[in-house]
Regions:
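Class II aminoacyl-tRNA synthetase-like tRNA-binding/catalytic domains
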Residues: 5, 9-26, 191, 197
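Metal-assisted phosphate- and nucleotidyl-transfer catalytic regions
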Residues: 37-153, 178-198
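A residue-level signal for conserved active-site and pocket-lining positions in enzyme catalytic cores
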Residues: 21, 85, 125, 162, ...
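Short conserved micro-motifs at the rims of enzyme active sites and ligand-binding pockets
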Residues: 9, 29-33, 135-138, 163-164
C-alpha cells in the first residue's frame, strides 16, 4: 500500500506490504477477535517453521525478540478506547515530542507508551474521532467517533488497523460530504450500499512491521 505521510517516524512508512482481509456479517468485535487469532497464528508459524531465522534475529538484531513475540502470543489483547488513551497520555509523567489532545492522530511515541507503559502488552485502541479516520468506517451512535481499531504491540506500536465498515447508504453519503469527497468518482462504491449490503468489517496487517529489524530497509523488498 502507499499513503501520503511524512517520513519523520521510523514506524510510519509511506509504502509497505499488507494483508487486507474483509469479513462479511462481522462487527468491530468480530474484527478484533480475528486480528488476535491471525497475529498469534503468524507468530507461532514463524517460531515453528523459521527457528534458524528467529535465532539469527535474536543473536544479531534484537536479543529479546523471541521472548517478546512469545509474550504477545500468550497474551490476551486488551481493549481501550481512543478517549481513554488520550486521558492516560495527558496524565503521563512524560514529555512527548508531539502534543497530546483529543482529536490528534496518535504518533508512535504515544502508541508505544500506551502498550508498553500503561497496558504492558498488546492492546486494541478503538472508537477514534471520525475526522482522522477513513470515510468508510462505521459511524458510532455518538456521531463523533467511528468503529475503528488499531492493534498496538510493545516494541512497534501500531501493527494492525481495522474497522467495521459503514453499510448505511445515507450515513456513508453524509460522511463523504463532510470530508468534501467527489462522490461521482466513487459512485460504484456507494452503489454497493444503495442496492443492498450487509454488516461487514476488515483490517490491514502491516507485514513490514512484524520483523524484529529496526531498519525496515532490510525487510521492505
Amino acid at each position: 500500500t502507499d499513503r501520503s505521510r511524512g517520513l519523520g517516524d521510523v514506524y510510519k512508512r509511506q509504502e509497505f506490504w499488507m494483508v487486507e482481509p474483509e469479513i462479511a456479517f462481522a462487527d468491530l468485535e468480530d474484527d478484533m477477535c480475528l486480528i488476535e487469532e491471525m497475529v498469534k497464528y503468524c507468530i507461532q508459524y514463524c517460531l515453528d517453521n523459521a527457528p534458524e531465522e528467529m535465532k539469527f534475529f535474536e543473536q544479531m538484531v534484537d536479543h529479546d525478540c523471541i521472548n517478546r513475540i512469545t509474550k504477545v502470543r500468550d497474551s490476551h489483547f486488551a481493549r481501550m478506547t481512543y478517549t481513554e488513551a488520550i486521558d492516560h497520555l495527558l496524565k503521563a509523567d512524560v514529555k512527548f515530542d508531539n502534543k497530546v489532545e483529543w482529536g490528534i492522530d496518535l504518533n508512535a511515541e504515544h502508541e508505544r507508551y500506551i502498550c508498553e507503559e500503561v497496558v504492558g502488552g498488546p492492546v486494541f485502541l478503538t472508537d477514534y474521532p471520525k475526522e482522522i479516520k477513513a470515510f468508510y468506517m462505521r459511524l458510532n451512535d455518538d456521531n463523533k467517533t467511528v468503529a475503528a481499531c488499531d492493534l498496538l504491540v510493545p516494541g512497534i506500536g501500531e501493527l494492525v488497523g481495522g474497522s467495521q465498515r459503514e453499510e448505511r447508504y445515507d450515513v456513508l453519503e453524509k460522511l463523504m460530504d463532510e470530508k468534501g469527497m467527489n462522490k461521482e468518482t466513487l459512485q460504484w462504491y456507494m452503489d454497493l450500499r444503495r442496492f443492498g449490503g450487509c454488516k461487514h468489517a476488515g483490517f490491514g496487517f502491516c507485514l513490514l512491521y512484524t520483523s524484529p529489524s529496526p531498519r525496515d530497509r532490510s525487510v521492505s523488498r
